[in-house]
Amino acid sequence: MHDQGGLLPGFSHIMPPYWYKYGEEMSHQEFGLYAANKLEERILELGAENIAAFIGEPIQGAGGVIIPPDNYWPRIQEICKKYDILLVVDEVICGFGRTGNWFGSDTYNIKPDIITMAKGISSGYIPLSGIMVGSRVSDVMINEGGEFYHGYTYSGHPVALSLIHI
C-alpha cells in the first residue's frame, strides 16, 4: 500500500484486507481471518509491550475503497483485546452514515477504544473534526492524566465553533 516511500519511523504495518489483490485463492471468510491474523503474527514478532495501538479504517478509502471481509474487524478486535492493545478506528471517511450505519465500526460490530472523525460531521462544508474515546482511555485520562492540553488543525475556526451552540 505504501510503496511511494517510507512513513514515520517506528510504525509497523500489516497487509490490507484486500481480497482482490491478495486473497483470490481463498474464500472471503478464509481471507478475512488470514489477513487479520497477520496482526497477531506482527505482535508476536515485535512483542505486545512494544505496540501501543492498532490503527485502521473500517473501509480503506485511500487504497481504492477496500471493503474487508465481514470477519476481519471482529478478529482484529479480538486480537487487540487478547494482547491489551488499543484499537483506534479512523472514521474520517466511513463515519456518519456512509456505510448505512452511523459508523463503519457499527457495520462490523466492533467497539474501538478511540474513533477519529471529520468530514461527515459537517458534510465537508466546515473544517470540523473530533475524537471519541471509550472508558478504557477516558478513565486513565481523567484519573491519572492531569491537564489535557491539545491543539488541532481545525482549532479555533469561528464558524465550526459556532456549530457547538446549535
Give the residues covered by each predicted segment.
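Conserved N-terminal phosphate-binding loop of PLP-dependent enzymes in the Aspartate aminotransferase
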Residues: 1-164
